[in-house]
Regions:
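Glycine-rich phosphate-binding loop of actin/hexokinase-like ATP-binding domains
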Residues: 151-256
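Adenine-nucleotide phosphate-binding core of ATP-dependent small-molecule kinases
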Residues: 266, 273-277, 284-319
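Glycine-rich beta-strand-to-loop/alpha-helix junction loops that act as flexible
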Residues: 9, 91-93, 209, 323, ...
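Internal helix-turn-beta structural module
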Residues: 299, 303-319, 323-324, 333-402
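Short beta-strand-loop/turn "lid" adjacent to the catalytic site in phosphate-handling enzymes
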Residues: 71, 75-123, 144, 150-159
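Short glycine-rich, Thr/Ser-proximal phosphate-binding strand/loop in the N-terminal lobe
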Residues: 12-57
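Phosphate/pyrophosphate-binding loops at sites that engage ATP/ADP/AMP, CoA/4′-phosphopantetheine
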Residues: 70-85, 193-198, 313-324
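Catalytic phosphate/nucleotide-handling subdomain of diverse soluble enzymes
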Residues: 219, 224-260, 266, 330-361
Length: 402
């Protein structure tokens, strides 16, 4: 079964074509600057060179057709015709409370995704555009949507409710939803496999650390808490996002800085985080280089970030009544041995620690704890596209018997 996996952003489309017989990636690609000057498709057949196609891409409909044309191109394509695509799997950021699992696309599902757009105004509309574009191009091919929020729908009320009047939850759905669910789900399953069991056997803390970062408590296969909240702004200090702050800072900014709601949103989402603390960059590679040169604020930004992650590890260990494994994933979690080491400093009380030699791992699944550790520590590259493809196959086989 061949699955076309699509992730549509506001001005981009990422895609993979995966043969699920062996879970082999046949090709992947990225279209950038949709609706802008200088748009480009970077298409990479597995094991071959990347093809750059510079062409105006006015919208997602055109972009999806361009991607499929690349897949069937006689020179750099990997299938002979579009009819070889058996199903399409889409990433959708926010499913609200309506969607607690991946689903086959119907008219009701499309309406539901649109209704959740107010919860993710930057993400759900382009996600929906991608679904509609694929439906128009391949009307007979089943479409499945996989929600970032779905994995966290197993959180209990005590974890997802805020200390606000209950009416806000009833009227507007104001609660913790959590994000990066597809990534947290994948790496928890991989960690369990590496420990020789099922994910339902273990208590695992998953740390998805990149420009956007979150931590999740996965207890016996189910998410029981996560750091992001009603929006992806909550929780950890991130690249440009503040993470959790005292809510009274917002009226303070209104009075002292004469900010309106839009300006505050910009301030907290795009000018804060390690960028705001360092005054230099949101890229941890830049911060580490500057810190090595003696830049104190860059070092401070790194320290604040690592400390917040460590706090969540401690909190989620308590919430689960213990922990069997800690997993680092995403760009920073997978690739920064120094950040993993800093976060894990002082975890000896859990009966674990980082092995400096094993911790040099990059780009592959690796156990990085000291020998004999009671709590395993892993660095695991995430693979959200594979989770989307797996869910797509499972739903298609269960519902339409493909």
């Amino acid at each position: 079964m061949i699955v076309f996996v699509v992730n549509c952003g506001s001005s981009s489309i990422k895609y993979q074509l995966i043969n699920m017989n062996g879970e082999k990636v046949l090709a992947k690609g990225l279209i950038e600057r949709i609706g802008m000057d200088g748009s480009v498709l970077k298409h990479t057949p597995e094991g071959k060179y990347t093809v750059d196609i510079n062409i105006d891409v006015p919208d997602h409909n055109f972009g999806i057709k361009l991607a499929v044309d690349a897949l069937v191109n006689p020179d750099y394509g990997v299938i002979k015709s579009m009819s070889e695509i058996d199903a399409v799997g889409h990433r959708v950021v926010h499913g609200g409370e309506r969607f607690s699992d991946s689903v086959l696309v119907t008219s009701d599902v499309l309406e539901g995704i649109a209704a959740c757009a107010e919860l993710a105004p930057l993400h759900n509309p382009p996600n929906l555009n991608g679904v509609k574009a694929c439906m128009a191009l391949m009307p007979q091919v089943p479409q499945v949507v996989v929600f970032d929020t779905a994995f966290h729908q197993t959180m209990p009320e005590k974890a997802y409710l805020y200390g606000l009047p209950y009416e806000l939850y009833v009227k507007y759905g104001v609660r913790r939803y959590g994000f990066h669910g597809t990534s947290h789900k994948y790496v928890a399953q991989e960690a369990a496999r590496m420990m020789g069991g099922e994910v339902s056997d273990y208590r695992i803390i998953t740390c998805h650390l990149g420009n956007g970062s979150s931590v999740a408590a996965v207890k016996y296969g189910k998410s029981i808490d996560t750091s992001m909240g009603y929006t992806p702004l909550d929780g950890l200090v991130m690249g440009t996002r503040s993470g959790e702050i005292d809510p009274a800072i917002i009226p303070f900014l209104i009075v002292k800085e004469n900010m309106d709601a839009e300006q505050i949103d910009e301030y907290l989402n795009r000018r804060s985080g390690v960028l705001g603390i360092s005054g230099l960059s949101s890229d941890f590679r830049d911060l580490e280089s500057a810190a090595h040169r003696g830049d104190e604020r860059s070092q401070l930004a790194i320290d604040v970030f690592a400390y917040r992650v460590k706090k969540y590890i401690g909190a989620y260990t308590a919430a689960m009544g213990g922990v069997d494994a800690i997993v680092f994933t995403a760009g920073l979690g997978e690739n920064s041995s120094s950040m993993r080491e800093k976060i894990c400093e002082g975890l000896e009380y859990l009966g674990t620690g980082i092995d400096p030699v094993k911790n040099k791992a990059r780009g592959r699944n690796q156990e990085i704890n000291v020998d004999g550790a009671k709590v395993k520590i892993f660095a695991i590259p995430t693979n959200e596209e594979l989770v989307i493809a797996r869910d797509t196959v499972n739903i298609c086989r269960r519902i339409i018997k493909l």
